[in-house]
Amino acid sequence: MKSVEDWPLAQLQAEAETIRTRINALRTSLSRFFVQKAELIDLMCVAAIAQEPLLLVGPPGTAKSDLVLKFKDALGLAEADYFEYMLTRFTEPSEIIGAIDVKELRDGRYIRRKEGKLPTARLVFLDEIFKSNSAILNILLTIINEKKFYQDGAPEPVPLKILFAATNEIPEQGELAALKDRFVLKVLSRPVQDNYFTELIDSGLRGEAYRALNQKPWVEAHATLDDFLKANRYLTYQFAATRSTIDGADENDRLKFFPPDVFAEFQRIVKTLVREDNIFISDRKLVKLYKLFRVRAWLLSGGTVTRSDLVLLAYLGESLAEVERLREKVPLLLGD
């Protein structure tokens, strides 16, 4: 099997439109098995292509974990490539990255038995992520930031590509600020029973029946994890490219795919959110936002960023109040 580094640009260019079609088929197919969750599924696909963590926020029973499980199933992912865990303040590192190998310890080496744990997974789902204690927090930050963990004091790469996390609430504690900042996008999973009572009953009943019968009709072989990895690699090649125009000038990704009027609108909205709502947007987050805009534009329309892609600014909140406020304000700023 080829690694990501072995996929040449020419091959990815030839496959790009087919890959995009397959991912969109998965996106629309999954939406059929949920009530009013298309927004979340779209963001899951964008985050997965960009390889940026996504935080699902909402009360219990709003399909957060079910969305991730069905997404994993739809990819046809092997169990060895998937890890999920519900965190508590009592969670120990061994539950996440593996127990200490006693035999190795007798020989003076501090080695963890990582098989079946987070360090071997390519898709990870962490429920109640903000319940992390300080030991877990440090491990997660190293894995998210640097894609590595430590064995016997030496860094070892992890294959993590997609990270989804869920929380019932977004805490205010300062020690969690670094972890929160790693989730550029935070999306609400809202209860739908008030407006979609009948649809919820019908969909929920079908879901219970599928589980009882061990059926997974959402597994329709539309897209695989490799499709998402190839999409990421293809877009990364584009981000790195500098092209010469017919008049000999250099044209980078922004000049080619981000029209000046849309870019100016991006700047205007960011400045408005910082000035009027005191939203903190780090320099790192701005760069990641650009990447996410481009991924969304490529997935939904094939390339050029439009004003509709700027809706991702609605998911920047660092607290539940900010998440709620931006959900209302950003569409207004966009004139939607």
Which residues make up each language-model segment?
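Conserved RecA-like P-loop NTPase ATPase core
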Residues: Q36, M44, L56, I96, ...
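Conserved C-terminal "switch" segment of AAA+ ATPases
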Residues: L9-I23, F33-F34, V187-I279, G302-G303
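Conserved NTP-binding/hydrolysis module of P-loop NTPases
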Residues: T88-D107
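Pre-Walker A (pre-P-loop) alpha-helix and adjacent loop at the N terminus of AAA/AAA+ ATPase modules
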Residues: E15-P59
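Conserved alpha-helical scaffold flanking the Walker A/P-loop in AAA+ ATPase domains
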Residues: L43-V46, V102-V124
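C-terminal engagement/docking regions of AAA+ P-loop ATPases
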Residues: E5-L9, G58, Q267-D336
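Canonical AAA+ ATPase core
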Residues: K103-R109, L123-N232
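Walker A/P-loop
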Residues: C45-T88
